[in-house]
Swiss-Prot record:
The keyword Disulfide bond does not apply. It comes from the Bacteria. Belongs to the universal ribosomal protein uL18 family. This is Large ribosomal subunit protein uL18. NCBIfam families: L18_bact (TIGR00060). CDD domains: Ribosomal_L18_L5e (cd00432). GO terms for biological process: translation. Keywords: Ribonucleoprotein, Ribosomal protein, RNA-binding, rRNA-binding. Signal peptide: none annotated.
Amino acid sequence: MFKKNDRSQSRERRHMRVRKKIFGTAERPRLSVYRSEKHIYAQLIDDVEGKTLVAASSAEQGFDGVGSNKEGAKLVGKMVAEKALEKGLKKVVFDRGGFIYHGRIKELAEGAREAGLDF
């Protein structure tokens, strides 16, 4: 009998397949996105050094909005883009984290693009 994979297992497998191809550098870091039920998180990662350069989330103290809806995701995208531009980072590689490019993930990407990130 076949055993059905749960959603989180399938997402992790998709993420691993994508991570084989996507790699962030100091000049063009990886914009990694994670979506939980209540919040959304985004960070720019330099995979060569293994360090996070910039991070933003809906769980931060100064966040005005709700992290579980599209408007909140767009705000997080704008927040991470503003922090990246302050550090002189304009070009990034988008890593959707195994999530479908739809809904909150798509809104975060559009918010980051509107604020000035190029991907």
